């Protein structure tokens, strides 16, 4: 006799769909019999520069210790982060990617009968983390593709324990300013933990986008999450972190898996954090690449959503799925975002200049075919 194990799962889990990542290069190569080296992937917001040379050197040095468990407390990385982020060591929580931090929050603070509030067109992990623990996901309609913070505030009720906000937002790239953030934080009830997801904050230097760290001291119900997957180029190693009050950090560490960040990731993240030249190059490449894609969209008569991330959403003015498939046949992988409620858009990662040109030419060809 076999049971229906889908029906036996939590109701919230039954309603979820598995997370779908950007299509891997090898998968497309197998499907279309293409040379993997000929494929351009601009689908997963990865850093086109590759990893920092200093991070790669640190990984090589750490290889001899693979038989040993990593430092479960991540002391070296926490110390560097505490110094750079102007916090105490006991305010830092390390995660297996920043999505691990989001799940730790859900595991610690959400349960059946409670809810989390987040925006439409927001990161797919928010509903996954929320519903996986049996809590209710309260999705607030977006405003001009971004967070409607007053509406999100109005959605908070006595059963709300967490609000997820992202600045800049993924997948839209939209952002809000310091005054809007401060006004929001002032009015959020003290019993609600605000998770400020800053996965792309490094790309927004010099803009009007606020630094969440500037608000930590004033708001004990604020947690800032960040990652080494984007601007630091360590996506494969899965390392992120959260910054909060010591009390919140202590709670998260109670539900954190032992050794959740591996030794190679710890070593690489420490080295990457010190490589200011690499980070500056990443920012410069992203800025010029964004300008290149915007100019290309303008020539094609397409509109786009202004972005502060390392990606941009282009509006095709039609259902994007056939164009996405056409680009795949041209050996170019981007990201359809219909599952985010954006069926006419494609999200495109900023690549190297040649990759951006290849994408724009492929897009021109696919659109011309109709």
From Swiss-Prot:
InterPro entries per record: Aminotrans_II_pyridoxalP_BS (IPR001917), Aminotransferase_I/II_large (IPR004839), HisP_aminotrans (IPR005861), HistidinolP_aminotransfase (IPR050106), PyrdxlP-dep_Trfase (IPR015424), PyrdxlP-dep_Trfase_major (IPR015421), PyrdxlP-dep_Trfase_small (IPR015422)
Catalytic activity annotation: L-histidinol phosphate + 2-oxoglutarate = 3-(imidazol-4-yl)-2-oxopropyl phosphate + L-glutamate
Pfam families (UniProt xref): Aminotran_1_2
Single GO MF annotation: pyridoxal phosphate binding
Keyword ATP-binding: no
EC number: 2.6.1.9
Pathway named in the protein's UniProt entry: Amino-acid biosynthesis; L-histidine biosynthesis; L-histidine from 5-phospho-alpha-D-ribose 1-diphosphate: step 7/9
Biological-process GO terms, alphabetical: L-histidine biosynthetic process
Gene3D superfamilies: Aspartate Aminotransferase, domain 1, Type I PLP-dependent aspartate aminotransferase-like (Major domain)
Residue positions where N6-(pyridoxal phosphate)lysine is found in the record: 230
Required cofactor names: pyridoxal 5'-phosphate
Presence of the UniProt keyword Cell membrane in the record: no
Keyword annotations of the record: Amino-acid biosynthesis, Aminotransferase, Histidine biosynthesis, Pyridoxal phosphate, Transferase
Entries under CDD domains matching the protein: AAT_like
Quaternary structure and partners: Homodimer.
The family this protein is said to belong to: Belongs to the class-II pyridoxal-phosphate-dependent aminotransferase family. Histidinol-phosphate aminotransferase subfamily.
PANTHER family: HISTIDINOL-PHOSPHATE AMINOTRANSFERASE (PTHR43643:SF3), HISTIDINOL-PHOSPHATE AMINOTRANSFERASE 2 (PTHR43643)
HAMAP family: HisC_aminotrans_2
Protein name: Histidinol-phosphate aminotransferase 2
Source taxonomy: Bacteria, Pseudomonadati, Pseudomonadota, Gammaproteobacteria, Pseudomonadales
Gene name for this UniProt entry: hisC2
